[in-house]
Amino acid sequence: MLVSYKWLKELVDIDVPSQELAEKMSTTGIEVEGVESPAAGLSKIVVGEVLSCEDVPETHLHVCQINVGEEEERQIVCGAPNVRAGIKVMVALPGARIADNYKIKKGKIRGLESLGMICSLGELGISDSVVPKEFADGIQILPEDAVPGEEVFSYLDLDDEIIELSITPNRADALSMCGVAHEVAAIYDKAVNFKKFTLTETNEAAADALSVSIETDKAPYYAARILDNVTIAPSPQWLQNLLMNEGIRPINNVVDVTNYILLYFGQPMHAFDLDTFEGTDIRVREARDGEKLVTLDGEERDLAETDLVITVADKPVALAGVMGGQATEISEKSSRVILEAAVFNGKSIRKTSGRLNLRSESSSRFEKGINVATVNEALDAAASMIAELAGATVRKGIVSAGELDTSDVEVSSTLADVNRVLGTELSYADVEDVFRRLGFGLSGNADSFTVSVPRRRWDITIEADLFEEIARIYGYDRLPTSLPKDDGTAGELTVIQKLRRQVRTIAEGAGLTEIITYALTTPEKAVEFTAQPSNLTELMWPMTVDRSVLRQNMISGILDTVAYNVARKNKNLALYEIGKVFEQTGNPKEELPNEINSFAFALTGLVAEKDFQTAAVPVDFFYAKGILEALFTRLGLQVTYTATSEIVSLHPGRTAVISLGDQVLGFLGQVHPVTAKAYDIPETYVAELNLSAIEGALQPAVPFVEITKFPAVSRDVALLLKAEVTHQEVVDAIQAAGVKRLTDIKLFDVFSGEKLGLGMKSMAYSLTFQNPEDSLTDEEVARYMEKIQASLEEKVNAEVR
């Protein structure tokens, strides 16, 4: 919200520096982004009168003689198409500073001396988006009463100061000058001075020519007025200046008035050309599938059943609360105008504007809420201004449908509760003073009082809101401070917090870098890297489809980061994230999803780069597995890895499911080449673990066990196996022998070739045995090996070589 300080001072009698006001507003609840003046950095720009203007042959240039209030005229060469004799213009004299700190100097153009520059608004730093279209390609023409030689700033209100407010959703009342004026008046204990709009009506009743009806509960109220004999023309300079300072482009005297009322009351309005209507009945209803509407921006919009539309003769003429239709817009030929003021459902407006990516000042205000008590007042004010500025006559009465509750909202409290919550010792007189300054009604006494809250402050509905208002206006800086009471208890980390720290320690120790990715993603990426996707949890009104669904995995987000870095030649990456994924087993519209703590990482590129001593070491499956092994060793968990091809986003031959007993903890594998190509990344290995499941499996601290004094014994065994037998199957067969003294199994060699026969391979293992209470004998170890050999022959048909 941009606030003109000049305009604000017309509404509230204050005389403090704008920066001081900004600081005061920030400390009382409305954040101020900054204060700027359009004239900042500009100098030596004066009013000039064009005395003569001659064309330069074979060019678009003009030689102008300009009166700038000096004894002698100045010759200035100008290329603007709208320069002509007899107009007042903005002249930057030699030495002047214009936008971007550009300094104007004397010069020659096509051999013609130019002693300055005739300026456009853009050359003074005014955004092209707010410059009136009639001056968009040329210079700004000043009012006829502008005095040559005087600075131009006051004529265009460039000497104003613009306060930019950052309005939070709960203070949408400050999206209007009236709302800001009430706030400033309360801060400085001043009265508001709102303009009185005088409206004169004709004897001809508007209801005789127009009817209004509402066919949906999404539009509580709709009102319209009819104006005749309208003369469309540019708005007066003061109104154009005000709108440009507020960031709005002036259009014409009718449209500019609706924008003025929007800023003044916070009430969105729209003007229709009555002569373009095909009927006399305005209906507010929900759109039908298949209906279309060309909006004011020239775009044809496909309407949905959730959209609110204004119709005439059952044809949409406007998207309610968002944008009008092109067919009924105000043009230079318009002479009969219908003014609209209404209240629309904010959620419906937000859904429509979000779906169409069509946001406007009006839709923003409907989404956040408007003052329902001033709808008719704003409509009357707009009619009054158009009658004054466009010579219009206003038909008698407002044509409306629906009802509005404009009565004050009553909220009760006690002085004891106020002081208890705020930690103060306020008197009832202090509370009375606060609500008097706010313009609220108050009845009762210290034991029990009731505050009557005007509809302009629709954010105040409960007792806690009263406490906040008292604290704001009384002054946060005046509230007493105290040290925390010494009655707390020492806290400790939860199990999941400890687990997250352990995981982070292992990941950082392995050289991984932590990142944080979005929990919202696309519907397609949400279910990637999941064997059994759950129901999608979708946002009702996403800002973009890229952030519309809660993720069910973290890998896709990490791969987006990998792709971003790879595209920028950062190819050796080891990234991890600890966060939450969301599993929805019920109806997303009725139930919240389960939040699952997870850990995921992605590795790509080289583990170690090539140097003069060693070859480059690329990332592979086993390097990724080693990180997980280190983690599980730290946690004291014995997990198993089982090959799988059920996760379609992963390589079917290089993927394993990680299990603890019968419970699946996660997966490890290479990103499927097709998926990697879609992300535009090289060979990448990923893993994801369910930390919530691991948390439930963690055991209490293992008691100290004395290191045995007795030596371990190792035996090597080479096995001839069929090629399809896996390492895990061999390990399972060895463990199935039930040898209690077996403490370690290591695979140290794998060989296949013609000598072994077709479809055969050799795998060599080192087996370690140890008795913590005694030395093992050769006979005992031999018996263990016999049991293991028998199990291998039975389970995997192994032949000991």
UniProtKB/Swiss-Prot annotation:
Its EC number is 6.1.1.20. Gene3D superfamilies: 3.30.56.10, Bira Bifunctional Protein, Domain 2 (3.30.930.10), Ferrodoxin-fold anticodon-binding domain (3.30.70.380), Nucleic acid-binding proteins (2.40.50.140), Phenylalanyl-trna Synthetase, Chain B, domain 3 (3.50.40.10). Residues 708-801 form the FDX-ACB domain. Binds 2 magnesium ions per tetramer. GO terms for cellular component: phenylalanine-tRNA ligase complex. It is an enzyme of class 6 (ligase). Residues 39-153 form the tRNA-binding domain. GO terms for biological process: phenylalanyl-tRNA aminoacylation. Belongs to the phenylalanyl-tRNA synthetase beta subunit family. Type 1 subfamily. Tetramer of two alpha and two beta subunits. This is Phenylalanine--tRNA ligase beta subunit. It comes from Streptococcus pneumoniae serotype 4 (strain ATCC BAA-334 / TIGR4). The lineage of its organism: Bacteria, Bacillati, Bacillota, Bacilli, Lactobacillales.
